[in-house]
Curated annotation (Swiss-Prot):
This is Pheromone-processing carboxypeptidase kex1. SUPFAM superfamilies: alpha/beta-Hydrolases. The lineage of its organism: Eukaryota, Fungi, Dikarya, Ascomycota, Pezizomycotina. It comes from Pyrenophora tritici-repentis (strain Pt-1C-BFP) (Wheat tan spot fungus). GO terms for cellular component: membrane; trans-Golgi network. Its main location: Golgi.
Length: 639
């Protein structure tokens, strides 16, 4: 016999302990990722020099494999202080890569996967953090039975994400934090802001996050005001004329909507019968005898016409962005987890169809409380139909905050709109009162930064209080009511050497702290393993001195096999994260549409057909597990 019965017990126990420790190591290592694990070493198609970027997943729900994807760009220049902008797109279920690759990010995708610098990107004086949320959106993922349903759930996930993200990147935790986005993010952003403010008040032991402002473009905040704005907007812009049969049919749909609202729908985030007002206008204005690509009004930009999808093919950059983000080398560069089984799609219909928000109230209900604590800027492109400026202005006019109603300077006296000139052209209007700013962009769509990146950058810098006077550079030609105000700059310019040196020291200290923390974990693990091995060796020597036996390997082999060590090494645990194989297809062109009817959309783009009775304000995908009659109704104010 190779081993006596006495030592066999403790050897088995200790070996089992060693195996458990080894099994524990991957989990520890996975949890203790460092910045280096997220660093983007190379981005296909990007011009040189490469910007400093990090990307990857952060787990927010271990039980259901909920992981949020982020893409972070470090600012190019430092003004008087560090600032971070968290950008979120709408949907619910539309990827923030829209913002990164088509709006405010430093790169735009051109033919052949070539990236070009975006003239007017928001990363000049601010770090940019794009997050695909809720879970399941874009590159984010979750078990297919665990999509979110309420706005409070979404906000809780974002707080968890930020806690973990700041632990990984502590150098940014004290930055002035701004949250920006558009469309359905008009619900996301106020909910997240409220959750952050609550977190700052309750968690005294934790460092408060300095939330300094919110920016919401063409936001879906007050459903009632937005529903009732469709007819006035259509009249103002000549989409239909009052008194016509067309107008009467649309007005009848509005009467049905009002009945639903009065019957308890005032607190709903969306109401199906009210969504049909815009649907009816699009139906009534459709010209089926026109060229197939010019039959329907583009709901995101009324200056444009589209096929029967009425704007779902827009913006045109999407034809380049989608195949780029599905490329295997791009997926690898962005550190996409292998648990993410499906290729990137702009909008996920499964996320949208589950996110009903039936127990959530519209963000407008508590927006005044947020404005009391945080400056808010709302901006609107005046050619957007789906979340149009008429509805936003009605919401503001009806809103009471900080001791007044609407933009009144005193009871009955309104703060006047100020003309905004940018680089010699009329850019829009600017209006402020009691911590709220409202900006209208002339000749602009649902995605204002897509149309005017330089103008939105000027707006951002004014709102954040960036002043380049202390650091040099040519100021932008920007006037509000004929006055320059703080000097802003849109373009390359020198940086503040002192600010850069001070920040460099802070970054190095924070990075050293992060690396030290991961080193301490590795040291603890090494000590545990060394102690177990040492104890094994010591007991082995004692046993040999007291007893001699067969020194063959037969006994050891029997022990290892009996404990199932080989099986342990081969064992692989799989979970149903997403029920599909990874799709690396490259879309060389926008698929041709069949033109079979209103809202017919090619599944190649991940969007589903809509029938005449229901229309999605955004885009659904073939991931949608709901019935086809439900797929169309979700409000995807889209991008």
């Amino acid at each position: 016999m190779a081993f006596s019965h006495a030592p066999s017990g403790w050897r088995t126990a200790l070996l089992a302990g060693l195996i458990a420790t080894v099994a524990w190591l991957p989990a520890i290592v996975a949890q203790e990722k460092t910045q280096a694990d997220y660093f983007i070493h190379d981005l296909p198609g990007a011009p040189k020099p490469l910007l400093k970027m990090h990307a990857g997943h952060i787990e927010v729900d271990a039980e259901h494999n909920g992981n949020l994807f982020f893409w972070h760009y470090q600012n190019r220049h430092i003004a008087d202080r560090q600032r971070t902008v968290l950008w979120l797109n709408g949907g619910p279920g539309c990827s923030s890569m829209d913002g990164a690759m088509m709006e405010i990010g430093p790169y735009r995708v051109r033919e052949g996967g070539k990236l070009e610098y975006n003239n007017g990107s928001w990363d000049e004086f601010a770090n940019l953090l794009f997050v695909d949320q809720p879970v399941g959106t874009g590159f984010s993922y979750v078990n297919t039975d665990s999509y979110l349903t309420e706005l409070d759930q979404m906000a809780a996930h974002m707080v968890i994400f930020l806690e973990k993200w700041f632990a990984l990147f502590p150098e940014y935790e004290n930055d002035d934090l701004y949250i920006a986005g558009e469309s359905y993010a008009g619900q996301h952003i106020p909910y997240i802001a409220r959750a952050i403010l609550d977190r700052n008040k309750k968690n005294q032991a934790k460092s408060p996050w300095p939330l300094k402002g919110l920016l919401i473009g063409n936001g879906w905040m007050s459903p009632v005001d937005q529903y009732l704005s469709y007819i006035p907007f259509a009249y103002q812009n000549g989409l239909m004329r009052s008194g016509t049969d067309m107008a009467k049919r649309v007005e009848e749909q509005q009467r049905i909507c009002v009945q639903k609202l009065e019957a308890g729908g005032m607190d709903a985030v969306d109401t199906r019968d009210c969504e049909q007002i815009m649907v009816r206008i699009l139906q009534e204005t459709k010209n089926e005898n026109a060229d197939p690509m010019n039959q329907c009004l583009n709901m995101y930009d009324i200056r444009l016409r589209d096929d029967s999808s009425c704007g779902m093919n827009w913006p045109p950059d999407l034809a380049q962005v989608t195949p780029y983000l599905r490329r295997a080398d791009v997926v690898q560069a962005l550190h996409i987890n292998t648990d993410k089984k499906t290729g990137w799609q702009e909008c996920n219909g499964a996320v949208s169809s589950h996110f009903r928000a039936k127990n959530s109230k519209p963000s407008v209900k508590f927006l005044p409380e947020v404005i009391e604590q945080v400056p808010v800027l709302l901006f609107s492109g005046d050619k957007d139909f789906i979340c149009n400026h008429v509805g936003t202005e009605a919401m503001i006019q009806n809103l009471q905050w900080n001791g007044g109603k609407g933009f009144e300077a005193s009871p009955g006296v309104q703060n006047a709109k100020q003309d905004w000139m940018f680089e010699g052209e009329a850019a829009g209007t600017w209006q402020e009162a009691r911590n709220l700013t409202y900006v209208v962009f002339y000749n602009s769509s649902h995605m204002v930064p897509f149309d005017y990146p330089r103008r939105t950058r000027d707006m951002l810098d004014r709102f954040m209080g960036v002043n380049i006077e202390a650091i040099g550079g040519a100021p932008a030609d920007s006037l509000i009511d004929g006055e320059k105000g703080p000097l802003t700059s849109v373009g390359d310019h020198p940086n503040s050497t002192k600010a850069e040196e001070d920040k460099s020291k802070e970054l190095k200290a924070a990075e050293w702290k992060a690396y030290t923390r991961s080193g301490e974990v590795a040291l603890v693990i090494a000590v545990i393993v060394a102690c177990i091995c040492g104890f094994l060796l010591c007991r082995s020597r004692r046993a040999k001195s007291a007893y001699k036996g067969d020194d063959s390997d037969e006994g050891r082999e029997s022990l290892l096999t009996g404990m199932g060590l080989d099986n342990f090494r081969r064992k692989e645990r799989r979970q149903d994260v997403e029920a599909a194989d990874f799709d690396e297809r490259e879309l060389d062109e926008v698929p041709k549409k069949s033109g079979k009817g209103y809202g017919q959309i090619s599944s190649e783009k991940g969007r589903v057909p809509h029938n005449d009775s229901s229309f999605s304000l955004g885009v659904d995908s073939d991931d949608d597990e709901a019935g086809s009659s439900d797929r169309g109704r979700r409000k995807e104010e889209s991008r």
